[in-house]
């Protein structure tokens, strides 16, 4: 915790003279220990907890008042959905390449350092941070509400129904993204391709569905 606070630019001036409790209190106040309420001074942490700390750190504000992940790159793609991972790039490489809703003409981004194949991020929405070369530095999932369902019948012009019988209203200006395609389409242009048995993920903001993601537009 202390090391991450230092990386964020904090020092004993902000944490106070009492160590380690002062640092733990500071970490809690900026959200660094969010989701880790059981964390105590001197307690061991496991890998999952350590990973959570690093994810939290990306979203924390630095001592200068800036969101940390926004200081890491030169270009930030907001509210980006990861459409596909391991895709083929122009040079034939597939190592860690991902396609997102921020890409134009189905271009694929590569990681700035090392290889990666973040399958768990497919279908997630968040902010994509790029360097000067347009390569990925990090992806920070956002806190948008996401609901995944399997369609019980073909999608309709104004709504969809899940296997559990629940119905969801979708506005005509919602964007639909298919994992195998590069660019989004309006709901009215895309809903007819979402047939019974298709799994979709719907993203909501303030109670309104604003985007829909599907790995495929046909029943598998």
Task: List PLM regions with ranges.
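N-terminal propeptides
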Residues: 1-164, 186-189
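Generic structural signal for alpha-helix starts
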Residues: 34, 93, 170-172, 210-212
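A cross-kingdom feature marking solvent-exposed beta-strand/loop segments within repeated
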Residues: 113, 173-187
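Active-site-adjacent structural elements in enzyme catalytic domains
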Residues: 132-134, 142-144, 192-217
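Acidic Ser/Thr/Pro-rich low-complexity disordered segments
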Residues: 159, 172-175, 219
């Amino acid at each position: 915790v202390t090391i991450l606070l230092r990386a964020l630019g904090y020092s004993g001036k902000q944490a106070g003279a009492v160590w380690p409790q002062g640092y733990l209190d500071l970490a809690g106040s900026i959200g660094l220990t969010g989701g880790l309420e059981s964390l105590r001074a001197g307690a061991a942490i496991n890998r999952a907890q350590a990973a959570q700390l690093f994810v939290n750190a990306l979203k924390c504000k630095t001592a200068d008042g800036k969101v940390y992940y926004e200081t890491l790159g030169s270009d930030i793609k907001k509210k980006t959905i990861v459409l596909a991972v391991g895709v083929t790039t122009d040079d034939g490489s597939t190592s860690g390449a991902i396609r997102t809703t921020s890409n134009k003409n189905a271009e694929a981004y590569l990681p700035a350092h090392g290889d990666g194949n973040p399958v768990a991020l497919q279908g997630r929405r968040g902010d994509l941070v790029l360097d000067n070369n347009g390569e990925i530095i990090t992806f920070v999932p956002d806190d948008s509400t996401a609901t995944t369902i399997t369609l019980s019948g073909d999608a309709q012009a104004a709504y969809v129904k899940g296997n559990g019988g629940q119905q969801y209203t979708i506005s005509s200006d919602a964007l639909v993204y298919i994992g195998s395609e590069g660019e989004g389409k309006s709901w009215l242009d895309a809903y007819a391709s979402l047939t019974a048995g298709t799994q979709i993920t719907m993203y909501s903001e303030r109670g309104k569905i604003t985007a829909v993601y599907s790995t495929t537009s046909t029943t598998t």
